[in-house]
Amino acid sequence: MTTLYIDADACPVKSEAERVATRLRLPMVLVCNGGLRPPANPLVSLVIVPEGPDAADQWIAAHCGPGDVVVTTDLPLADRCLKAGAQVVQPDGEVLTPANIGPRLATRDLMQDIRAADPFHQGRGGGFGKAERARFLQSLDRVMAAAQRIG
């Protein structure tokens, strides 16, 4: 059965993901370091991992597999999930695949190097609004349908 895993720390689309999981009657797992209330929805569970770097990422990567969907902005986690057979959607609606994760990781690493070399070079994050939420919902619907065929 398809499970929707959410890298929940600072995820801006938890409620949208819950709506999709509820509509499809599929389990959703919020994974975080704490600070979230236990969900009232019986389809949604909360996993609180110990404090520490990448603890939530490690938990998600260890539990996801073919037919599952992961929502994350963390590219190394996305790479691990894709290698485990899961599908990955970013909160902005971009679907990550084995074909596009390599260039995304390379760009991420390059930008980290640039920021380390020039502390005044900071990225300018765009806003997150209705258009991004709508794009996320469309992508998640499409990916969940494909995942259900696998799982």
From Swiss-Prot:
InterPro entries: UPF0178
Protein name as catalogued: UPF0178 protein Pden_1915
Entry-linked HAMAP family: UPF0178
Phylogenetic placement of the source organism: Bacteria, Pseudomonadati, Pseudomonadota, Alphaproteobacteria, Rhodobacterales
Pfam families in UniProt: DUF188
Domain of life: Bacteria
Species annotation: Paracoccus denitrificans (strain Pd 1222)
NCBIfam families found in the cross-reference section: PRK00124.1
Family label: Belongs to the UPF0178 family.
